[in-house]
Structure formats: C-alpha cells, structure tokens
C-alpha cells in the first residue's frame, strides 16, 4: 500500500512539475542570463541616470533577475558618436543620448530640434509619443539601432560668461558650444553667434579655459555638470525642447527571444513616466540651486522670445525643405494638432 501511495505521489509531483514548467516558460526556457551595458553622457545624479536605474529595476523584476543592466554614466563608454558606433557594432547594448545625436544617420531627427516648435511639456510628449516620434523611430533599425521611446531632457537654455541674454542681439559674437548637429549650428548662426560644435565630454574644459564663451543645455545638465563654476549668466531662452531616446543595439536586440524583447519594451514604457516626472521636478529645482551657487538668472520678455522665433524661422524652413516630404508633412500636421 505504501508503495502504491509513493508511486501516486511521485506521479502527481512529476505532473505538477511539468505543469509548472509549462506555466513559467518565461523564466525557465526563453529568458537567458544577460548583462546589458547601458552607457550615457550624464552624471549619476542626473535624471537620465534615474531613468536607467528604474529601467534596470523593472527589467530585473520582469526577468526574475536574469536580465541585469550595468550602468556606465558620465561618458565612461565614450562620447555620443562613439557610443552610437558601439551600439551599431553590437559592442555596447544600450544608450540614452539626446535625439540630436541621431541627425547624422537619420537627418529627419533634426525636426525634433527645430527651435521654438513646442511651448510646454504636454506638447513635447504629444509630439514624441505620437505618430511623428514613431515614424522617426521606424527609420532606425536599418541603421543598426532599435528605439524603445523618449525620455525628458528638458528645454535648452543659454549660459555664458559675458552677459545676460535678454534679446537676440545679446548672442551676437558669442562663441557658443553647440551639439555637433546642423540645425543647432544654423540656428545660432542666425542669431549671429559663433557656434562651436564640440562633444559634451570636452565642454567643461572649454568653458573653463575660455575656448568658448557659453553653451546651451537644460537646467539639470547645467547644474549636474557644475557649469555654474565657469559660467556667470543663465538665461531662460527655452529655444529648443530636448529629449533623450532609449536606444538598443539591433545586433543585441535580434539575439533576444520575443519574450525578452517584450520585457525590455515593457520596462522602457513603465520607466518613461517616472523619468519624465523626475526630470521636470529637477529642472524646477535647478534654477533656484543655480542662483544659490552664484549664477545670475534672467528670463526673456515674451516679445523678445517671439523675435527669436522669427529670426530662426528661415532656418526651420530651409531644413524642412531638405527632409523627406512625407515626414515633414506629418510633422506639420502633428504640430498643428498639439497646438490646438
């Protein structure tokens, strides 16, 4: 009798084991142990880093701890172009650069950098999370990249060591470091500044040595990188809304199972709202903190901002004429929709 009971127990345990194996194929079969090298340019106290950490927590939870994200902040894996090449080559798995860095491989990403295109965060999110943002993302796989959505970097503002910027004329003659991106170059040329393209990692040294007079970045970047130590004036030009884009190496992506890809997409989607919230709260705090560190802060009168928009308009029209007309039409339609 005992033998029969033990046999039945053994059979039921085996059946239960099989049922369990079938119920959790995610962890048992098609999720492998993986280490994902996630590089970015920002410091560990910057909102982009908080986004990486939240993404890592979510992905670890979804994969039963099998998919681990290893963060490399502060340009440890190279500048934006070096990290982009590493993703394309499959050497690095993930990065979160500014969308501006992609204009060299998909020129239509320049649309995101058009000056004074959006007036607030709600408009920015609607533009990037909607059809335009997705149409741009669809251009990346053929370039060796997969994008999982957009994070917040913030509205860009000018700092310099010479004078407050209260009107467009105040930019005249200033050597302003810009992202190596044609839209930024031509925008600041329109303001009669002297734009100097330069990798982000070299920027602090260039400001310190006075190789350049100023730069333009969101408040949280200005604070996190201690630019207030080498820049006296912070001016709320709000000339461009900047976003980061969560990128994955296509070579790495193609090596993942559908389930692993699903977990990565879900973790990216769920971390996006958190990252944006943290980033926007940090930007609000940063202005006061910059003033406390001795920076002179000024806002621009709406009339002067409107003048800047008019000066930049021919730049927008010139670049729009050089892009894929279908994407430009989509951009125009979307801008009209989000401004309603």
Q: What residue spans do the PLM features occupy?
A:
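N-terminal secretory/targeting leader peptides
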Residues: 29-123, 131-134, 138-340
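Sec/Tat signal peptide C-region and signal peptidase I cleavage site
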Residues: 24-28
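Bacterial N-terminal signal peptides that target proteins for export
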Residues: 2-16
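Hydrophobic alpha-helical targeting segments used for export or membrane insertion
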Residues: 18-22
């Amino acid at each position: 009798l005992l033998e029969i009971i033990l046999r039945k127990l053994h059979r039921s345990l085996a059946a239960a084991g099989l049922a369990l194996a079938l119920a959790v194929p995610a962890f048992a079969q098609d999720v492998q142990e993986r280490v994902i090298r996630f590089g970015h340019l920002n410091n560990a106290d910057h909102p982009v880093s908080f986004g990486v950490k939240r993404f890592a927590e979510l992905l670890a939870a979804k994969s039963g701890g099998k998919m681990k994200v290893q963060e490399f902040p502060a340009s440890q894996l190279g500048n934006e172009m070096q990290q982009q090449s590493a993703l394309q080559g499959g050497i690095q798995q993930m990065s979160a650069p500014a969308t501006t860095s992609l204009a060299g491989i998909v020129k239509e990403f320049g649309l995101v950098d058009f000056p004074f295109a959006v007036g607030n965060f709600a408009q920015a999110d609607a533009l990037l999370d909607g059809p335009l943002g997705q149409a741009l993302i669809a251009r990346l796989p053929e370039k060796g990249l997969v994008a999982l959505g957009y994070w917040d970097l913030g509205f860009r503002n000018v700092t310099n060591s010479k004078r407050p910027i209260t009107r467009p004329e105040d930019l005249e003659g200033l050597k302003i470091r810009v992202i190596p991106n044609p839209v930024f170059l031509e925008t600041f040329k329109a303001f009669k500044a002297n734009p100097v393209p330069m990798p982000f990692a070299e920027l602090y040294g260039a400001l310190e040595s006075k190789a350049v007079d100023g730069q333009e970045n969101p408040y949280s970047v200005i604070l996190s990188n201690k630019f207030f130590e080498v820049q006296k004036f912070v001016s709320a030009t709000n000339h461009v809304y900047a976003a980061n884009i969560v990128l994955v190496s296509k070579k790495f992506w193609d090596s993942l199972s559908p389930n692993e890809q699903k977990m990565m997409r879900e973790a990216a989607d769920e971390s996006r709202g958190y990252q944006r919230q943290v980033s926007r709260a940090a930007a609000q705090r940063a202005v006061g903190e910059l003033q406390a560190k001795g920076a002179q802060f000024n806002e621009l009168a709406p009339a002067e901002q409107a003048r800047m928009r008019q000066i930049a308009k021919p730049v927008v029209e010139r670049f729009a004429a050089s892009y894929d007309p279908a994407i430009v039409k989509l951009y125009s339609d979307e801008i009209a929709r989000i401004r309603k």
